[in-house]
Amino acid sequence: MPLEEAPPALAPAAAVREFRVAGDLGIGLVVAEPQISQPLSISFDDRGRMWVLQYRQFPNPNGLKPVQVDNWLRTKYDRLPDPPPKGPKGNDRISIYEDTDGNGRADTVKDFLSDLNLASGMALGYDG
């Protein structure tokens, strides 16, 4: 279907109502924009906290200017970035969401690590 014929995006709560799950399973909205942006990786620790890698600057890294994009969306930039920690600060982050009142919604968020540039994965250790 052409993009101009696509239906408008649903609000988060409306989108959850459209899901169909099997048997006695359930689904609920834990967190939505603007509290979260472009989640790429989600993990839960032993305390039930949700750790989220937010890929907020995809597809272009901070500090670089796109100069050419081909038919396959491969991008050439004005320069090669310096490797961390010398390169530009990014906008990606790892955040920790927690439901402290037991209602199924994340009511606290803490940025664990920020200023990442094109972060693409994370792994949790013991106790987060």
Task: Outline where the language-model segments fall.
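Beta-propeller domains with acidic blade repeats across secreted/periplasmic ectodomains
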Residues: 1-128
